Amino acid sequence: MPAGLTEPAGAAPPAAVSASGTVTMAPAGALPVRVESTPVALGAVTKAPVSVCVEPTASQPLRSPVGTLVTKVAPVSAPPKVSSGPRLPAPQIVAVKAPNTTTIQFPANLQLPPGTVLIKSNSGPLMLVSPQQTVTRAETTSNITSRPAVPANPQTVKICTVPNSSSQLIKKVAVTPVKKLAQIGTTVVTTVPKPSSVQSVAVPTSVVTVTPGKPLNTVTTLKPSSLGASSTPSNEPNLKAENSAAVQINLSPTMLENVKKCKNFLAMLIKLACSGSQSPEMGQNVKKLVEQLLDAKIEAEEFTRKLYVELKSSPQPHLVPFLKKSVVALRQLLPNSQSFIQQCVQQTSSDMVIATCTTTVTTSPVVTTTVSSSQSEKSIIVSGATAPRTVSVQTLNPLAGPVGAKAGVVTLHSVGPTAATGGTTAGTGLLQTSKPLVTSVANTVTTVSLQPEKPVVSGTAVTLSLPAVTFGETSGAAICLPSVKPVVSSAGTTSDKPVIGTPVQIKLAQPGPVLSQPAGIPQAVQVKQLVVQQPSGGNEKQVTTISHSSTLTIQKCGQKTMPVNTIIPTSQFPPASILKQITLPGNKILSLQASPTQKNRIKENVTSCFRDEDDINDVTSMAGVNLNEENACILATNSELVGTLIQSCKDEPFLFIGALQKRILDIGKKHDITELNSDAVNLISQATQERLRGLLEKLTAIAQHRMTTYKASENYILCSDTRSQLKFLEKLDQLEKQRKDLEEREMLLKAAKSRSNKEDPEQLRLKQKAKELQQLELAQIQHRDANLTALAAIGPRKKRPLESGIEGLKDNLLASGTSSLTATKQLHRPRITRICLRDLIFCMEQEREMKYSRALYLALLK
């Protein structure tokens, strides 16, 4: 036996083995059982026999009185599989047989006088009582050894152990209760992986189930609105629940649903207003508003108006009708508004902490499951080969404290960091009964945590999942630790790094019941959103997460369970952060919190992680109001009012009614029309307006097309330009004229300078004309100089900003050497569209009705 592995003082009662392989525990009066096994190589597929040696004292069978412990060990063998992906273990629970005839053999060296009786004292140890009243303390130490020799005992039970197989050990302690309805049990199921050689692909598990029973004389009932493992005896009357139930009978189911929604809305409003992210003044003001609303001091309109101002939120149109429908009935169900507000405030302080953090190890573990208590203890030890790691589960009963602070703690931790590569994996199960973790206090805290001390993880997985918690009238709380699979990241992984991290705690707030419900109505918990962050563990490897779905159920006896599958990924977000607070129906809050050392960092990020402002603003969602249903109801009830505004609107005439009616009667005299109805006048006025609108639209399009310049557009190519051709011809004429004028001037100058016969009249005329030409040129030069002087005195011409910007852009393009780049020119369209007579004539020519009309000819004459 390894050092330190000894049987506790409270040894288990003796056991016997039947021919069918059933190990039967005798009630009181036998020696412990020693189970031995032969070590076999880990990779072998052979069976490892396990022998159970029992030395009987007498050959007569023993009957199983009350308190008999029956244990059956049934192996489940499966061939080893090597694959790349992990798979979940498939544990199978074997039914327990009824105890048959039992034979107990004592060692040969033990001499007992006739009439000796083996009994178990109240303190735990076994005692031999002889007829002479001599009391001898028996040796109750059970040795766990591993030896290859097979004991020479005809009554042996061989348990075959194959790698990658799963075996279950089921131990059930049943005590006949006085009343079955008062039986309360606590079930602890723990599964431990056993990895194979090269890659961890199949995980065999050892399932240990402990079901203690304790008789009571009262029938326990469970409150539907409570989520903790609390029970209240039925002999204590609950006047508030009876009164609430009596009121509920008089209300219709629809009204009850509205009242429930309104109550949840007010409770959630108080919670969010009193949360840490809001100011204390806001919480006080919101509580005061709720109190005034419940006491009928203010009505729904004033309550919502003040609430919007206090929360700085946008108005919700459906909140006032919702409150009007349900607040009257809510006032009847909640006569005391102070107690309701006090319960809502206290709900934030009472939390139920359920924390699970399971970690897989790559070595072969030895499982020791211990449920300790001050009650009577019964144990059985099954041992195999030496294993390098021991994992123990202990349920401890804390010291007695205040009435509202009782708690049950279940701790699962690993012991021993050493690793071994060979030998048969041995599972050691030490099971002891304990009293149920059941109190009658409303605020009960149950903590389940797994703290690995120094596990060696090689590409393994850390799984965090909600335990399956089931509440009922005939059973207590069943806390199930789910199985864990190791996942090998790659075949080339050679280094093993220790992962040391603090456990993650999941807090499940347990508010007090605000409105008691009938005992037959189950209450389901629906999780909106659940995001978990894994705490950082220093320089650790990336851990792959396999999420297991768990079940969170609250039910009554005889009701069907309503599971809510929740998958919690933990590897997609940064460590030590909380993303969302989860709001559950029935005044329940499910939040996530890391280790106590990280609370300060989490509080700093509360404003950025939580979005309580959105929840406060969205009051309709908190009240559980379906907007589609409300809209349908409103449209259905007010359908007769639709269209009244349109029917009551008066048509505004486009033209003056008096002048229009006179003109219509003047035209109608030719057709014997002497009277005209007002509706006809209005219709003609509207028709005139529509005709003018259509005509203006056409004229606007025609004017825009007329004023559009297509020359600058890249989509058009200039094929002929008559205007430029005419300008070219005009320029030629001007050049010809300038040439002729220049020749005439030169001729005049030559004639003026000549000294020919002065009496020639032709010569005198030329001289006079040359002198006039010189005077004209001098006058033009003086006029140009005067204009330049005036322009210099006025100053430079101011350019438009748009033109200056375009010129600056051109200068920049030329300076940077990118003058070859040409921007796409858009069609120039003026901002003001001017319609002229040409546009109207063109429009009239295009219309078939106006093409041959008199108006077109009158327009053409203009």
From Swiss-Prot:
Principal location listed in the UniProt entry: nucleus
Region feature Required for interaction with P65/RELA, mapped onto this chain: 511-533
Annotated stretches, region: Required for interaction with TAF12: 830-862
Compositionally biased residues, Polar residues: 219-237
CDD domains (UniProt xref): HFD_TAF4
Keywords, sorted A to Z: Coiled coil, Cytoplasm, Differentiation, DNA-binding, Nucleus, Oogenesis, Phosphoprotein, Spermatogenesis, Transcription, Transcription regulation
Stretch list, region Sufficient for interaction with ZNF628: 100-241
Domain TAFH per the UniProt entry, residue ranges: 256-353
PTM per Swiss-Prot/TrEMBL: Under stimulation by forskolin, Isoform 1 is phosphorylated by protein kinase A (PKA).
Signal peptide segment: none
Keyword DNA-binding: yes
Gene Ontology terms: biological process: mRNA transcription by RNA polymerase II; oogenesis; positive regulation of transcription initiation by RNA polymerase II; RNA polymerase II preinitiation complex assembly; spermatogenesis; transcription initiation at RNA polymerase II promoter
Localization per Swiss-Prot or TrEMBL: Nucleus; Cytoplasm
Record's disease association: Spermatogenic failure 13: A disorder resulting in the absence (azoospermia) or reduction (oligozoospermia) of sperm in the semen, leading to male infertility.
Family (UniProt): Belongs to the TAF4 family.
Function: Cell type-specific subunit of the general transcription factor TFIID that may function as a gene-selective coactivator in certain cells. TFIID is a multimeric protein complex that plays a central role in mediating promoter responses to various activators and repressors. TAF4B is a transcriptional coactivator of the p65/RELA NF-kappa-B subunit. Involved in the activation of a subset of antiapoptotic genes including TNFAIP3. May be involved in regulating folliculogenesis. Through interaction with OCBA/POU2AF1, acts as a coactivator of B-cell-specific transcription.
Oligomer status and interactors: TFIID is composed of TATA binding protein (TBP) and a number of TBP-associated factors (TAFs). Heterodimerizes with TAF12/TFII20 via the C-terminal H2A-like histone-fold domain. This heterodimer forms a histone-like octamer with the TAF6/TAFII70-TAF9/TAFII31 heterodimer. Interacts with P65/RELA homodimers and P65/RELA-REL heterodimers. Interaction with POU2AF1, via its C-terminal activation domain, is required for octamer-dependent transcription. Interacts with ZNF628.
Protein name per UniProt: Transcription initiation factor TFIID subunit 4B
Organism, scientific name: Homo sapiens
Gene of this entry: TAF4B
